[in-house]
Amino acid sequence: MLSTKTLPSSKAQESLQSPTKGSYWITTFGCQMNKADSERMAGILERMGYKQAEEELQADLVLYNTCTIRDNAEQKVYSYLGRQALRKKLFPQLKLIVAGCVAQQEGESLLRRVPELDLVMGPQHANRLETLLNKVETGQQVLATEELYIIEDLTTARRDSSICAWVNVIYGCNERCTYCVVPSVRGKEQSRTPPAIKREIENLANTGFKEVTLLGQNIDAYGRDLPGTTPQGRKKNTLTDLLYYIHDIEGIERIRFATSHPRYFTSRLIEACAELPKVCEHFHIPFQSGDDEILNQMRRGYKIKTYKKIIGRIRELMPNASITADVIVAFPGETNEQFQRSLSLVEEIGFDQLNTAAYSPRPNTPAALWPNQIPEEIKIERLRKLNSLVEIKAKERNVRYKDRVEEVLAENTNPKDKQQLMGRTRTNRLTFFPKVDNQGNSYKPGDLVKVRVKDIRAFSLSGVIEN
């Protein structure tokens, strides 16, 4: 149990603010799917009349949308909950909610551990937030973790950006990777229909959005659960078909998608990305390990030669494409030779960026029970070596941008320099540039700007506007 039996000291009480009635605060942990879910839940709260608080300790409804991919993310949630449990002792009107994957995984045990919680809700219940809150208002402590079919959400999301939007197209995951909890907490794959997706993107375009990122745990598995096949025997509604279907929506300048699984990244999809002008040349395709035996133990369903073939075809058709990925080091039983194969793959492919992690045992996954766990000190050392190589290769990849003119979609003012805008290239490189060009023309978020790159860093660029 996180809460204490006694109230905080008078001095501590003075440091805690009384909640502002009708205000909310959402803290999001983890992946882009969680960010999209949080935007939808914020939209529901604002439809109900809530206003976003200026800071977390002012809110009288606090929601943590949680991630359980790694243990450190989960533990961070509990530290946040301890602070809010303290507030709830002083301000009983505070509503305290845990949503997302920790909620789904822990369920009733989370309510026992943190009895101050009003609502524990899994990710499949994000669209039901209003219904669940109405139950909370009657004095109930609510648990919502049962599996259900995700109905189309008619709520307007409260977007964190007015330029770029996340659009969920497939929920859940049918894979059974031995290290991953996602299938157990997000349920089986459920694809939205193409017309529903198109309507959402059209609405975004009508309100000024310029870029959409299609989201899915395995985005390229989209449509496997939808009916219909072509005369050639393939599924009728694939991600490739969806890209063609939404491509010509007026007002949308750019289309991205994430995250891809190598098993479903077809040649037809690569060719469509090369053909369709709005689809950006950035592909996030996790490889997880550079060793075939480890991939087999992970139950990933492909070999490294398949992965290399995918990257080769992308670079053949789109030479300037950026490739990013996820990789795990120190998976149970990983030898030094197997780890070296991951380093060799990073060296060979030259990723633009990698999300790196040391293996973290997760509850209810096969790999967590295996006896050959890697000692912590070896995990740390392997991760250090990998991160060092990643930074070197990222800098090498960025050299190609030097003095090149790139199309950048301006997204925001640079918070560290109000005279600069920041945005991303088509290849997803964060880029900083002046708001005003050398002829006195001003630019704003939402503008597509030609920027000549002058300075390069490992993970960002800066330059001047090209007239």
From Swiss-Prot:
Name the GO cellular-component terms: cytoplasm
Pfam families, per database record: Radical_SAM, TRAM, UPF0004
Entry's InterPro entries? Answer: Elp3/MiaA/NifB-like_rSAM, Methylthiotransferase, Methylthiotransferase_CS, Methylthiotransferase_N, Methylthiotransferase_N_sf, MiaB_methiolase, rSAM, rSAM_horseshoe
Give the residue range of the signal peptide.
none
> This protein is called what?
tRNA-2-methylthio-N(6)-dimethylallyladenosine synthase
Q: Which family does it belong to?
A: Belongs to the methylthiotransferase family. MiaB subfamily.
Q: Where does [4Fe-4S] cluster 1 bind?
A: 31, 67, 101
Domain of life, source organism: Bacteria
Enzyme nomenclature, EC number: 2.8.4.3
Native organism: Prochlorococcus marinus (strain MIT 9211)
Q: Where in the cell is it found?
A: Cytoplasm
PANTHER family xref list: CDK5 REGULATORY SUBUNIT-ASSOCIATED PROTEIN 1, MITOCHONDRIAL TRNA METHYLTHIOTRANSFERASE CDK5RAP1
